[in-house]
Amino acid sequence: MRHTRRNIFYHELIGLRIKIIEYPDKSLVGLTGLVIDETQKTLLIETNSGRRVRVLKANGVFQFMLPNKEKVIIRGVQILGRPEDRLKNIVR
């Protein structure tokens, strides 16, 4: 199944380009990079300079770039939970 705007919640986010649109720590707003790890509550982002930043999903609004170059904005609370649990839900 391809990544689309409608089914991104069920896909693995690791490997997608990301930009932080809103976040309580204003120094992180605008940060761009690649999602290199995901847990139930966090995303680990590697910036273009190689810096790694872990952010809480629930606190932010993120823009993901899908493999087809489409940009999707998602509130972090929509992607809370372990990635494997989100993937299991699509099978049910």
UniProtKB/Swiss-Prot annotation:
Q: Where in the cell is it found?
A: Cytoplasm
Q: What is an annotated GO biological process for this record, any one?
A: tRNA 5'-leader removal
Task: List UniProt keywords, sorted A-Z.
Answer: Cytoplasm, Endonuclease, Hydrolase, Nuclease, tRNA processing
Top class in the EC scheme: hydrolase
- Domain of life of the source: Archaea
The catalytic activity, as recorded, is: Endonucleolytic cleavage of RNA, removing 5'-extranucleotides from tRNA precursor
A single Gene Ontology CC term: cytoplasm
| InterPro entries per the UniProt record, alphabetical | RNase_P/MRP_Rpp29_sf (IPR036980), RNP1 (IPR023538), Rof/RNase_P-like (IPR023534), Rpp29/RNP1 (IPR002730)
Q: Write one Gene Ontology MF term.
A: RNA binding
Give its E.C. classification number.
3.1.26.5
NCBIfam families tied to this protein: RNaseP1Mthb (NF046110)
Q: Name the family.
A: Belongs to the eukaryotic/archaeal RNase P protein component 1 family.
Q: What does this protein do?
A: Part of ribonuclease P, a protein complex that generates mature tRNA molecules by cleaving their 5'-ends.
Specify the protein name.
Answer: Ribonuclease P protein component 1
- Organism, per UniProt? Staphylothermus marinus (strain ATCC 43588 / DSM 3639 / JCM 9404 / F1)
Its organism's taxonomic lineage begins at: Archaea, Thermoproteota, Thermoprotei, Desulfurococcales, Desulfurococcaceae
